[in-house]
Structures are given as C-alpha cells and as structure tokens.
Amino acid sequence: MVSTATKIATFAFDNCLMNAAGVYCMTKEELLAIEASEAGSFVTKTGTLAPRQGNPEPRYADTALGSINSMGLPNHGYQYYLDIVTEMQKDQASKHHFLSVVGMSAEETETILKAIQASDYQGLVELNLSCPNVPGKPQLAYDFEATDQLLKKIFSYYTKPLGIKLPPYFDIVHFDQAAAIFNQYPLAFVNCVNSIGNGLVIDDEQVVIKPKSGFGGIGGDYIKPTALANVHAFYQRLNPSIQIIGTGGVKTGRDAFEHILCGAAMVQIGTALHQEGPAIFKRITKELQDIMAEKGYQTLDDFRGQLQYKP
C-alpha cells in the first residue's frame, strides 16, 4: 500500500498534505473542516499578540495563474488559536497541529513565545518571519543579522518544537548565509516559501486590490519554480534534523511530488485550497499516490530529496 505518511520532529502524520497559514484557518470552524478532511494536519492563522482587522478590502484576488493578496495579518489573536490547539491535543484521536504566530515587534514575538512555553500546548509552532503585507513592517527573514539575534534570544528559553516560515530567497549566496544561521539552532523545520512579496496585478487600468497601492503577495502557479528552488537549496544546506515544508504552487499531485522530490517532508496548499476548499486534499492525495505507485515508490522516503541533475 502506497503511504503518504511523514514525520516532523517527533510528530507523525498520516498524510504529508496540509493547509498553508492564512488559508482556511481564520476560525475554529475552518480549522475543524481541515481536521475532518484528508489533510494530515492544519496550521492556524498567524496569531499576533492582539487581534487584528488587517488591511482594507478588497485585499485578495484570484488570477489566471494564482492569486495576489495583501491581507495584513487579520486574526483573532494568538490566544484564540492557542486555546483551540491546546484543547484539541487532549483528544487522542486528534491530529498533531501547527500553531502559527508572530509579533509586530521582536518584543511582542518573545511575549507570545514565552506564553506558549508556559502553556500546556505541546505541539509544533510555526514562527512567521516572512509576511510581506503589513505596511511599514519589513520581512524579518531578509535581515539575517536581526533573524540571528531573534533566534538566539528565542532558543535561550524556548524548548518546545519550533520552526520558521521563510520568504523566498533568490540569490545563491543568500541560501548559504541563511542556512549558516539556521544550522546554529535546534529548529524543527523551515517552511519554504511564503508568497513572493510586492507583486502587482492590473485589471484594465486599475490595480485589483486596495492596500499598498495594489502591491501584494503573489501565490499559485507563479511561484512554484521559486518555491521548489528554495526547498531544494535548503535541503542541500540544512542539518538533517531540520525538516523542510514545501509551500507554493501546489494544485495537483504532481506539484506535491515535485516538492517532495526537492526535499520537502510536508507540503502546504494555499491558493488552490482557497479556490477549491478542503476537498482538495482527497484529490491531491490520490493523485500523489497514483504517481508513487506508477513509479514503484511505497513511501515518501523512497524519493524525497532524490532530484536528478542533467549529466
């Protein structure tokens, strides 16, 4: 029987597919819909110290090749999501989950993580270092010195499993520099990638979203080559103990297969989930299993990271 089961840190998952933070995860009802689907897990909306309304609407638009958004981190506050995942972990039948968080400053991020450290939650945390859509707030993971300083502080007190969501990098030297920093810390995973920041989509003569004069994060088909490159570059450079979650441009089993071939242990779905709903996990899982069966692969480990190069 072909299996799409996988593992991140000490946590086992029946399926390698899940949602991406920001999609189908704002409310408890949405999270329960992902929980009830074929997805192996869910990640919550990125929770901030206080609830946020986010940017003015319209702030999301589908396009022929994906999507553009400038949501601005709307969420119910980290405590809302922490309560949900803490309650769900009491159920033996529950899946393991990811709690996504970030502060609007380094100090706020530490406040949140210290609260999680002191809580009963034992699951995975995804620290979002890469939101491109908050006006006046840069993507922290592009500042290597600041990222290093923040991780150094965090791991001086935080002992639970923690990973980071990264923006896309485009320069080989940046992969080298980032990996050198990440390898210094006991990260459970890195997630490659968040949307490509500050794209522009135009309808006739006008931008399609309102915030930031129409500038927003690009997702979907547009970003798959960039996402695959980031997954594989970090797979080549990171300590084996740091797993990789692949995110970007996944709407078929073939897309998921390519992420895993590049080194991903799990695969998140964003734009396509927004367009198709939680039933997408059943479809993509079957498509992935069919590809694996056709190639004679029984488990993800049979081909994960085995990308072939031209001789």
UniProtKB/Swiss-Prot annotation:
It catalyses: (S)-dihydroorotate + fumarate = orotate + succinate. Substrate binds at K45, N69, S70, M71, G72, L73, N128, N194, S195. Binds 1 FMN per subunit. Keywords: Cytoplasm, Flavoprotein, FMN, Oxidoreductase, Pyrimidine biosynthesis. The active site is at C131 (nucleophile). One of its GO terms (cellular component) is cytoplasm. FMN binds at K45, T46, N128, K165, V193, G220, G248, G249, G270, T271. It comes from the Bacteria. Disulfide bonds: none annotated. GO terms for biological process: 'de novo' pyrimidine nucleobase biosynthetic process; 'de novo' UMP biosynthetic process. Homodimer. Belongs to the dihydroorotate dehydrogenase family. Type 1 subfamily. NCBIfam families: PRK02506.1 (NF002702). PANTHER family: DIHYDROOROTATE DEHYDROGENASE (FUMARATE), DIHYDROOROTATE DEHYDROGENASE (QUINONE), MITOCHONDRIAL-RELATED. This is Putative dihydroorotate dehydrogenase A (fumarate). The gene is pyrD.
